[in-house]
Swiss-Prot record:
Residues 618-632 have a biased composition (Basic and acidic residues). Keywords: 4Fe-4S, Iron, Iron-sulfur, Metal-binding, S-adenosyl-L-methionine. [4Fe-4S] cluster binds at C310, C314, C317. Its cofactor is [4Fe-4S] cluster. The lineage of its organism: Bacteria, Bacillati, Bacillota, Clostridia, Eubacteriales. This is UPF0313 protein CPR_1216. HAMAP family: UPF0313 (MF_01251). It holds the Pfam family DUF3362. Disulfide bonds: none annotated. GO terms for molecular function: 4 iron, 4 sulfur cluster binding; catalytic activity; iron ion binding. Residues 597-662 are annotated as: Disordered. InterPro entries: Elp3/MiaA/NifB-like_rSAM, rSAM, rSAM_horseshoe, UPF0313, UPF0313_C, UPF0313_N.
Amino acid sequence: MSENKFLPICKDDMIERGWEQCDFVLVTADAYIDHHSFGTAIISRVLENAGYKVGIIAQPDWKSVDDFKKLGRPRLGFLVNGGNMDPMVNHYTVSKKLRKKDLYTPKGEMGKRPDRATIVYCNKIREAYKDVNIVIGGIEASLRRFAHYDYWDNKVRKSILVDSGADLLVYGMSEKQIVEVADFLNQGFDGKYIRHIPGTCYIADSLDEIYEEHIVLPSFKDVSSDKRTYAECFKIQYDEQDPVRGRTLVQEHNGKYVVINKPEMPLSREELDRVYALPYQKTYHPIYEKDGGIAAIEEVKFSLVSSRGCSGNCSFCAITFHQGRIVTSRSEDSIVEEAEEITKYDDFKGYIHDIGGPTANFRKPACKKQLTLGACKHKRCMSPGICKNMEVDHREYLHLLRRVRKLPGIKKVFIRSGLRYDYIMADKDDTFFKELVEHHVSGQLKVAPEHVSPNVLKYMGKPAGKTYDEFRRKFFKITERLGKKQFIIPYLMSSHPGCKLEDAIMLAEYLRDINYQPEQVQDFYPTPGTLSTTMFYTELDPLTMEEVYIPRSKEEKAMQRALLQFKNPKNYNIVYDALVKAGREDLIGNGPKCLIRDKNSFGKGNNHSNHKSGGRKSRNENSGRRESEDKKRSSHSKKQRGNKSRGFDQKSQRVSKGKKRR
């Protein structure tokens, strides 16, 4: 592929195309990857398809204005995003330590983007071109459009539209609204006065300027000074986050009014097909070849996006505030055509890594009502259980998988983007389940039960543990019948709001009973735009306004994390202290149900734990043996949990990186 098939990144590229000036210059905190898994690629190609000239400035040096001028002043304006991931999450771990690698940067090098990139870039653009139109979007802008709690500053920050000084904010996936914005700019409108488009935010000087039906939220001053008010404000945002029934929201910021128009409708199937058929080069720009490319492309190069939106609505997930709860999907033909294209890549080895989306086995709205009435205001589709009106049907997805796996040159089609096992179990037809196990598991199936404590699962918005048990038993039954050795990898989370030390110990006991120790544990990470983050900050559940326990101290968070890896000798002292603190000395000693040995009982060469660390035996034990292990519960655990089994029937020690939780 020749370099000039990418959009211009320098003046020479513009000259080669015969351009004197760009209509738009898109500034991004990621390296330039022209693949539809990256927002920069989609927005730039959608605008190109609408007839606009778009140039790209990727990862500019923000310490001067020079890089921001290298394509000249755009005719209509600058578009700015902070990359595919919020820059603060990209830079820092949950313990606020600097990460070692940036997968969206050449060589994985850190320091090529600033903290709060959207704000920094907008300031530099204003320095270079004072009165140019600036439109911000992407995940950073979308999830920070309201006044929001910021974990890294540990305070409530203003809307990013205020802090950045941009003229307009587009939120969500934004294909529809960005073209409409472009058309108005092209007609001569000032960006500040484009005010009626769904999925956009603007700043008004007074309430008299707002003509749409709207709700006035508590002001920035009010939510930043009172946590109960913050929680009440978030509840309104949460309820109105719907493109059908949602209303415009207004929030005062120091005498100005941030106006958040209702969300844009999700793209139809035909619209999605057109977006994904645009002439993406499906790789990084050739300028990165000398540095070995960009690692982020490896996760998506041989994967196919099937759908958008998620009906799961997990409390800790930001999908609700970005893509929304209404699921839409590409047509089978669109996906099959792209799969055929992938088979022609020189480095394709016959394996499609994924056909999915936020949740792989969602292909349509949860029920027929959603497209006309919107998602229910006071109910979740799948929590605490699956709604009776939810249409559970895997037939279309199954037919798609069959078509792709039959294509010449394709050896295997895997599913890696996450499956809702409760949705699978609710399907009365188990054909999909059988074919999933037979054809679409790469040795390990990743699912996200997250926890076992009923109390924690309630706050997470996750299904009851018994549903996972049923799924797990059926998975291993089918696996055994097929004569395969396949495992389940559970995503587990520590320190989620509502998780007390006894809840973490309950999870540790389950891990003990199945002889499984995760290599990695995810601490809850309070990121903007989620229900769980609001719980973390306010210590209230916004949906009920009841108090929520928050494991906030470093000591307790370390204890909860260590309990999930109690077999690790390095964690012995922390686990010991946690058990003593919780009054669970019954789990310290030499008994079969003890998590760790007593400090006085170590013999030469003995592990601090009473249990083997797993290893090959733990990975390869058959499911029948696992079933018997699940029945061996301590009397204390039974008393806590009642008769409901919420165990994890696991066979693998490895935990994969970088996948979204479902």
